[in-house]
Amino acid sequence: MGKTGKSNKNRLQVRRVVDVPLREVSGICLRRGRNGQMFLIAVGDRVAKIAWFSQPRSDGGRIDWHTSNIAKLSGSMLPKRDSQIEAVCADGLGRVLLLQETPPRVELIDPKALKVVASIDLAVEGRGEIAQAWSDPKGSRGEGAVLLPGGHLLVAKEKKPATLN
């Protein structure tokens, strides 16, 4: 029991703190390698850099970070600085998708081939509220993303209005 007499079992407990080799972290995800090994991937929106490590077998296991400059990958259109990468997710083949808020687009990276295999501009068509908000240069766009079956992508728009597209 805690000082207030309430149980601590429903409280978040920090098990480990790990420094990330990025200036800031805007997105994280898990990626399964071909042999089943799990990797944690982190991105930030200050520079076009990705950081990852292979998950250790135990909570206290050693973490060896690796980093790569995404802007140097073949086919990447990301600027080296102020890349505006807001989210990262991985598909079942181990490819990594990066969501860029400004300009609104995604890049799908094949980590084995060290190249961008697809770059897609994100546009909301029409004249409705969402389309107008999405095209506003001062507005908010994609802040989170999830890959869905059938090659679909779900994008979370942060605010004004907050939506799932």
Predicted feature locations:
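Sequence/structural signature of beta-propeller domains
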Residues: 1-165
